[in-house]
Amino acid sequence: MTYRSIMLSSAALLTLPSPAFSQAASAPSPAPATNAQPSASGSAVQPIDDTGDEDEIVITGARARGSVIGDIPPENTLDARDVRATGATNITELLDALAPQIGSSRGRGGEAPVLLLDGLRISGFRELRDIPTEAIQRVEILPEEVALKYGYRADQKVVNIVLRQRFRSTTAQVAAGAATDGGYATGNADLTRFLVQRRGRTTFNLHASGNSMLTENERDILLDPATVVGTPEQDLAARSLVGRNVDVRGSATINRTVFGNVSGTVNTELEHSEGRSLIGLNPSLLEPLDRTTNANSAHLGGVLNGTTKSQWRWTVTSNADLDVNRTRSDRDDPDFPTDHTRSTTASADLKATANGKIFKLPAGDASTTLTAEASTVHLDSSRTRLGASSSSSLSRTMGVAAINLDLPISRKNRGFSALGNLTLNANAEVDQLSDFGTLTTIGAGANFSPLDRMNFLTSWTREEGPPTINQLGDPILDTPNSRIFDFTTGETVLVNAITGGNPNLQSDIRNVIKFGANWQPFEKTDLRLRADFVHQVIERPISNITVTEQIESAFPERFVRDSSGQLVRVDLRPVNFDSSRRDQLRLGFDFSKPLKSRRPSQAVIDQLRQQFGFGGRPGGQGGTPGATPPSGSPPAVQGAPPAAGQVAQGGATPSGPPREGGRGGGGGFGGFGGGRGGGGGGFFGGNNANRGRLQFSLTDTITFVDKVRITPAGSELDYLHGDAAGSLGGTPRHQVQAQGGWSNNGLGARIGANWRSATDVNTLTGDTLHFSPVGTFDLRLFANPGDIPEIALKHPWLRGTQFRLELTNAFNARPHVHSALGDPLYSYQPGLLDPVGRTIMISFRKLFLPSPATIRRLFLQDRPQGAPTR
């Protein structure tokens, strides 16, 4: 293929749907034309493959580019079409769409998944957050045990994101939304520049977002007559349900090969946010009490990744962060009208990991991961209340050493093959903290695969964990007029609520046992079943206070009542309970099915070709079907071995290994590499039959036990049977998450559903509060006009655009709480538990693609030295 043909192909990229560019931008350099194949049907034109999703062709026995360390298979793998079918535009939205699959029951709660890029560690989420989904080749979701191989603890799922080898775009996106009940509006805007090529990747992002304030008078909130300060209208207007917030940030990530096979990444970010809320009515002036917040943060991160001559993979990550937060709160005291708090947190860490083989066993090579880490964090906080100032300063330095060992016991193709594949694991970690001394973590596990597509995991962990520096030293914040339900008296009261850090917290000890299974029952059907059972016991767990009779008996100093017994002040800062136990089972399945797409008409293809001056015929090097390709080489035959020196499909020569990320050879007008599986390919060739996707995912988290013992001699709280775990009552027996999506021919729809079963909470007065089951449904409709050839031909400006309509909580469902005695529950009104309700958002996104001149320059930069330009 001549270089002129390649440049003409590049011009075609700019007329066709935007994802098509990613095909050219991510494929290897042009392969010899001997791989071009005529259409199997004999037609001169094959359907346009506008998705640009070339499947990687992996030689049997070879690991796919970007695979993770070890032999634990992914629980689910999404290819580029699966990713696009979610309608997500960046990795942040993609992780939200995958929430049912990436949640874990092994952690203390709220842990984000471990993120890897091309099978390697990163410095943090900021590196990946703004990457457009069009740049993704595939996504792998893996169990918690894989985290050990990268120096993390096994308490969070692992998500490995593999990017295309070449991609370049500038993306602009704006969105605006509002609550259908009124009173609330939100919006955001993003501008992102992203480039990935052989020498590395670059990301620049500017982001702005904000929302308006929502007050109680904009919802049907009822007031307890005993708590009204002014008029009901004044009281409702003086308390916000959602505060106003504005956030602006800018970030940059640069990755390059620094020397040899070592790649380096630098990531930096600056962020500013400010907010305002109303915390009640000033009884003296009858004006709203105001609270404002101001936060500024700066981040600098770096990563070095490399491989030694002995094939040990090593990574060094470092981070430095500075966060400054200020809060100003009005008071109802004319002598001291405002309180002020300020906190400054500075932290830095350096972590090194290395993974490699250490000795041979009959079933394979034993491998290990070694980790060493040093970190420091310093928190300064100050507070001015009623004219009196106080301050505190906390510091923590920590050194960590950890080892993870994997021992293969049997393999199907080696000794003890009757056992299937079995690998044992052992891991240990020692943490030396300046404020908590020496803490240890030990664990063990097994990975067993008796049959193809069936995998079992079991693990045990004993971990000693310190409280965070913020749990210890956050500034104390006093919030007047906080509405709280007092389970002792069965009344809703307004109190002064104290929040902040508790310097007396102790470290906890967590014991976790997990049994997991993953099974794909059918080889040719993308259906995966998964199950995880987790038994967790924690000694001295750290928890926030809830206002119940049992907790008040255990911590009487945290509660202040007046002479009539009414609660007037409560300290909600975290405490250590004696112990807790939780048993959960997560059951789920993931299903994906390719859908046949509509073939563009021959007239549309001809118009595109004529518009850009394509004189040849598609499907090969401009020749007719069945003609001998240029250079006199015979046409390639599907499944036949390549001739001597010819590049095989997947980029491998007959005597050599596959090229990294190899794909099909060059063909058609694709120019930069063939389509799916070689032959044809490009825009006027390749397999176009199954571009659409139908997806469904369902996860049910079943809780069997959720108990807390407050003190060694105290009572026990059973969150499943009558005790309150938070504002939504106890722990539901079932929590169901579901995601479903359809995408084809440039259009798509996605539905998300969340449902929790009912709970009951008992009060000391003999009343029972019933928290009804609640389910919410989210709907996303999106259209990519540039993916429709007829539209892209008539309206070129629509290339790379997406229009999206989103409904959050589409049926406006809210939690409802009822008293068995029929008493009014002022603090459990639906408008308080879910103030915003249903929202509708409209967004527009434009993906700007490079010009033909830019594509030519990139090609010249990436072509091998000495290669002819024509």
What residues fall within each predicted segment?
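N-terminal plug
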Residues: 38, 42-50, 57-108, 122-131, ...
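Periplasmic plug
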Residues: 104-143, 171-174, 203-205
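Surface-exposed, low-complexity loop segments enriched in small/polar and acidic residues
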Residues: 115, 211-245, 253-399, 412-413, ...
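A beta-strand signature from Gram-negative outer-membrane beta-barrel systems
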Residues: 122, 131-173, 639, 645, ...
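Outer-membrane beta-barrel translocator/receptor signature
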Residues: 135-137, 152-159, 165-222, 244-250, ...
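Transmembrane beta-strands of outer-membrane beta-barrel pores
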Residues: 145, 176-180, 187, 197-199, ...
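Structural signature of Gram-negative outer-membrane beta-barrels, strongest in the C-terminal barrel
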Residues: 385-482, 498-522, 534
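C-terminal beta-signal and adjacent terminal beta-strands/loops
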Residues: 611-684, 704, 752-761, 783-870
